[in-house]
Structure formats: structure tokens, C-alpha cells
């Protein structure tokens, strides 16, 4: 398994002091989601990993909803760079 294949290009130029920002958290969750998804393609009955994936997806969804409310432009840039779909509105 390749460990760093999902490294984020978006945060290479920024300092590591900004690990608490919403964008950094969403990128790290997205990297973990992609790793777990590739793991689950091989191990279909790994139910604990499926549960962990659902938890991470929920956390990322909440962070994206927060960013969408606070700063729509940064939200659009982030989902464009990560190539993820926009969240559904209720």
C-alpha cells in the first residue's frame, strides 16, 4: 500500500502552524477517507473500518457545512481542489 499517494498539494506552501484551520482538517479527513476506501475495496467485510469511515465522513460533512456558512468562496475553492461533491442542502 502506498502511504503518501494522497498528499495534499494545497497545503504544501503553508506553514504547519495552521493545522487547526477548517481547510487543513477537511484535507486530512479526505486523505483518510481515500485510504480507507481503497482498504475497503480489498477487505469488504471489515465492518469496523466501515464504521470508522462513516464517522470520518460525518465529521468532514459537518466541517464543510460550517465552512459553507462562514465563507462560501473558500468552500467552493476547497471542494474544487479536492474534487469532492458539494453537500446537499436540506
Swiss-Prot record:
Entry's Gene Ontology cellular component terms: chloroplast; ribonucleoprotein complex; ribosome
GO biological process terms held by the UniProt record: translation
Keyword annotations from UniProtKB, A to Z: Chloroplast, Plastid, Ribonucleoprotein, Ribosomal protein
Pfam families: Ribosomal_S15
Taxonomy, superkingdom: Eukaryota
Location within or outside the cell: Plastid, Chloroplast
Predominant cellular place of this UniProt entry's protein: plastid
MF-aspect GO terms: structural constituent of ribosome
InterPro entries: Ribosomal_uS15, Ribosomal_uS15_bac-type, uS15_NS1_RNA-bd_sf
Nucleotidyltransferase recorded as keyword: no
Gene3D superfamilies: S15/NS1, RNA-binding (1.10.287.10)
NCBIfam families membership: S15_bact
Family: Belongs to the universal ribosomal protein uS15 family.
Assembly and interaction partners: Part of the 30S ribosomal subunit.
Name recorded for this polypeptide: Small ribosomal subunit protein uS15c
Phylogenetic placement of the source organism: Eukaryota, Viridiplantae, Streptophyta, Embryophyta, Tracheophyta
Gene: rps15
